[in-house]
Structures are given as C-alpha cells and as structure tokens.
Amino acid sequence: VWQRCMHQKITIKDCSAALTGLLLALNLPPEVPFWIPVIGGLFAIIVVKQLFGGLGQNFMNPALGARCFLLISFAGIMTNFSYNGFGGSFDATTSATPLAALKAGEVVNLKAMFLGNTAGTIGETSALLLLVGGVYLIAKKIISWRIPVCYIVTLGLFVLLFGGHGFDMTYLAEQLCGGGLMLGAFFMATDYVTSPITPKGQIVFGILLGILTGIFRLFGGSAEGVSYAIIFCNLLVPLIERVTTPTAFGKGGKK
C-alpha cells in the first residue's frame, strides 16, 4: 500500500515483509492484543525500511526496531508474559522472565529454560529449538558461523569474568539459555542488510554484540539487552566495514 501510494516499485513478492513480520512475532509476548503486531509491523516496514529506501537500505533490523518502539510505547503490554506449562493445563500463568528472576537473585529452572517451558516472548523461550534452527542455517550456509559463535562465546566470557558468580557453569548456562540471545545471535544479528559482509567485520561485530549485551544485562537497569546491542551495532556496521575491508594490493601507489 505504501509503495503504491508513493508510486514506487511494488516489491511484495520478495517476501521480505513476511520475514520481518515473522521475526517481529517472535519478539512479542504470546498474548498481546492483535493491534500490537499491526502497529509494530507498520513501524518496521514504513518507518525503518521504506522511509530509508526499501529493502537493502535500512540501517537497522526492522523487526528489532519495531520491538524497541513497542517496548517504549506500550511497556506494560510488552512486558506482560505468560505461558502454558507442559503438564496439559491450558490456564496461562503470568510470571517474570527467567533473566529478570536471575537478576533479582532468584533461583531459575535451567531445564525449563532450555526446553521452553517458561515465560518470555514467543521466540526466546526454547533455547533448544533455536539452537537446532541456528545450526541448520549454518549447515546450509544461509548464515555465517562467525557472528553467532563470536557473539555467544564473547558473552559467555564476559559473564564469567564480570557476572559476580566466578566460574559457575550453571549461572553461565542460565545466561546463555535465557532471554533473546539465541534468537538474536542466529536469526537477528545475521541479517544480511544490517551486518558486515567481510569475515573480519563479522568477527568484530559478534564480539561487540557479546560485550554490549553483557554490559546491558549485568550492569543495566533491564535484565535483557540483546535488542539494544544489535541495534547499536547495526549503526556501527559502516565503520566496521571501513576498518576491516582489506586494502587492494598496490592501491595508493604511484601511477
């Protein structure tokens, strides 16, 4: 509709809008009102993508941009999490996310976090399924391994060094399985448009993501920081590309 109104080429057949919608849905709590994803979708497609020139021109991940917009605008709705347990009951239970409980010093169930029997957004509850999907994308060479691996490893090292729990492997596993890390590392940070294309750039990008996520999680006011870390690093991609792009042999020599 926007492209028709602005007399632009119609690109709906490339399915990029559908992919953005799917990723946005994975970033939402399971019981949000229907108008929340509608507003988020409009923001992602029109504000983040189309206003900057359409597919390939957006400076940050559209789904994450919409998620942050919704968090700022409708914080109460976006942080109201509920889930149905695996025990067969259909009564939703409202609770804090595991990362929020962990930050408050409470005990969390690592097995439930790994399998997905816990509160959170749709795409951050089952670390197991996200890992399977991420490994599949890497095996099929749809995404590079550099960004997700460097991201997860760097965050893990940051947590061990600055998490205040020493080398507690259980605490480390809880940090890695909780929140949007797996979703962000494999499905959001690897977006072709908003991530570096050079191998060195992808490594630097992943390391920066891990450091920023660790800072936001451990020292910030919120228990989560994946979305903000990815968006911030999206803004640094041009600089990362400039620094890590190899100079052509002989460039700058005498003519």
Task: Name every feature range the model reports, one short phrase each.
Residues 218-255:
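Cytosolic-side transmembrane-helix boundaries in multi-pass membrane proteins
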Residues 1, 42-51, 67-72, 154-159, ...:
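Alpha-helical transmembrane segments and their membrane-interface exit regions
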Residues 56-131:
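Long hydrophobic alpha-helical segments that form multi-pass transmembrane helix bundles
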Residues 12, 16-17, 22-90:
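Membrane-interface helix-loop-helix junctions at boundaries between adjacent transmembrane segments
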Residues 59, 63, 172-180, 202-204, ...:
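Loop-to-transmembrane alpha-helix initiation sites
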Residues 17-26, 41-48, 129-137, 153-159, ...:
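Hydrophobic, membrane-inserted alpha-helices
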Residues 31-40, 113, 117-127, 169-181:
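Structural signature of hydrophobic alpha-helical transmembrane segments
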Residues 1-9, 45-56, 130-141, 186-195:
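C-terminal ends of transmembrane helices
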